[in-house]
Curated annotation (Swiss-Prot):
UniProt entry keywords in alphabetical sequence: Ribonucleoprotein, Ribosomal protein, RNA-binding, rRNA-binding
Organism: Corynebacterium kroppenstedtii (strain DSM 44385 / JCM 11950 / CIP 105744 / CCUG 35717)
Protein name, as recorded: Large ribosomal subunit protein uL4
Region (Disordered): 45-103
Keyword NAD belongs to the record: no
The keyword Transmembrane belongs to this UniProt entry's keyword annotation: no
Function: One of the primary rRNA binding proteins, this protein initially binds near the 5'-end of the 23S rRNA. It is important during the early stages of 50S assembly. It makes multiple contacts with different domains of the 23S rRNA in the assembled 50S subunit and ribosome. Forms part of the polypeptide exit tunnel.
Residue spans of biased composition, Basic residues class: 62-73
Family label: Belongs to the universal ribosomal protein uL4 family.
Gene Ontology CC: ribonucleoprotein complex; ribosome
Entry superkingdom: Bacteria
Gene (name only): rplD
């Protein structure tokens, strides 16, 4: 498989060279079950898991027998905090728990490659030199530039951590999500319609992704 070549767009509307997307990262077979498993694990890990209900032993009150055992014609009861009473404890209710699912690193990496490949095949990856011209942050300029690249609703912008100018320019835009290249993940790729990479962030991601593949092959 040959590498995919994309133009590098500039903020003034022109292009400045091209970049190659390695086929080993951006042109692989997509496994829907793998994507589902990895995304499910990601969303599960975000859950706090602090939900809790009180059992009959934790509800306040109910220490005294509500009425005598015999002679009333009613069913015997030992506490007004038993589960069948209003205000009583909960039976088998949710308790605090950890929702984390163990997902091997190779599965996460394979899912991310599959998600990126899907976006690349549908021309939904764009590469920019800088998000805004000059050294002054401008939300208006960032909105205009992204609007020229894509008219889709949700956009994921991948930037370098040191690119403070671009981060400040795009962070308040609605439906635009910003990530550093080292935090790129399957869920955010699939949750966005289009991806916009800065050249710096794209090169850093490719270097890390292809370097990890080389290490795996050498084992």
């Amino acid at each position: 498989m040959s590498n995919l070549t994309l133009d590098v767009h500039t903020a003034d509307g022109s292009t400045n060279g091209t970049v190659d997307l390695p086929s080993s990262v951006f042109d692989v077979e997509v496994s829907t079950p793998l994507l589902h498993q990895v995304v499910t694990a990601q969303l599960a890990a975000r859950r706090q898991g602090t939900h809790a209900t009180k059992t009959r032993g934790q509800v306040r009150g109910g220490g005294r027998k509500p009425y005598r055992q015999k002679g009333t014609g009613r069913a015997r009861q030992g506490s007004i905090r038993a589960p069948q009473f209003t205000g009583g404890g909960t039976v088998h209710g949710p308790q605090p728990r950890d929702y984390d699912q163990r997902t091997p690193k190779k599965m996460k990496a394979a899912a991310l490659r599959g998600a990126l490949s899907d976006r690349a095949r549908h021309d939904r990856i764009h590469v920019v030199e800088d998000l805004v011209p000059g050294q002054t942050p401008s939300t208006k300029a960032a909105r205009t530039f992204i609007g020229r690249l894509t008219d889709r609703k949700s956009v994921l912008v991948v930037l370098g951590r040191e690119d403070v100018n671009s981060i400040k320019s795009a962070r308040n835009l609605p439906n635009v999500h910003i990530l550093p290249s080292d935090q790129l993940n399957t869920y955010d790729v699939l949750n966005s319609d289009d991806l916009v990479f800065s050249v710096e962030a794209l090169n850093a991601f490719i270097e890390r992704a292809t370097g990890a593949e080389t290490k795996e092959e050498s084992k």
